[in-house]
Amino acid sequence: VCVKQVPDTNEVKIDPVRGTLIREGVPSILNPDDANALEAALRLKDRDRSTQVVVLTMGPPQATYMLRECLAMGADEAYLLSDRAFGGADTCATSTTLAAGIRKVSDVDVIFAGRQAIDGDTAQVGPQIAQRLGIPVVTYVQDIQMEDGSITVQRQMEDGYEVVEVQMPCLLTCVKELNEPRYMSVGRIVEAYQKKITVWDHMAVDLDPKDCGLNASPTQVFRSFTPPQKGKGEMLAGSVGEMAHLLVEKLNEKHLI
């Protein structure tokens, strides 16, 4: 399961001068869609106890807190890809690094990922990982039925859903409608802090520094900004004729007519 530690967007603010995110003092959380992806994997484990659930992330050393949350939910192993060489990565470079980590884990039947991360909203990393690994991908998954060697899923569409059968190994990106992530028990939280988290740098996953991080990122963020607030709405009262007259006056004031 590919997971990501993200800033809580309810607390995020933009530096008005530099146009960048102010991350200092902002709490970090497990990306919500990734929690649904992890729950999907854990439910497969609930049905078949021989299933091993592994969580993988790329990030700073502090991401171990998020990984321990995943372990407390029920994941068996956790891997952190952490290296200064990975810094400044766009989705292209991020997918390269995560794919390298997945190859290092090896013997993976299904890769789960959230539909998108709330700090980027691109929904690109999951499909890019699948492309780099040469496996099929199904996005916007809202239901999963697993059989021998294949998986049948419902793929969320704007006007309904699409039923897709896909062979394993494959990658599925999950939406929040798929499930309700489970809570962590006190016992599992204690166990999670007793488990080892494996940390890999670029050498451990056989990546050249020029092929990851900022060096391998064809896209870069030019500026982040908060859209200007829209004007407040105003309720008009009176008869139809009076309201029509007031509306015309308001539109004239704004030079809209």
Segments (PLM) and residue ranges:
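N-terminal glycine-rich FAD/FM-binding segment characteristic of electron-transfer flavoproteins
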Residues: 2-257
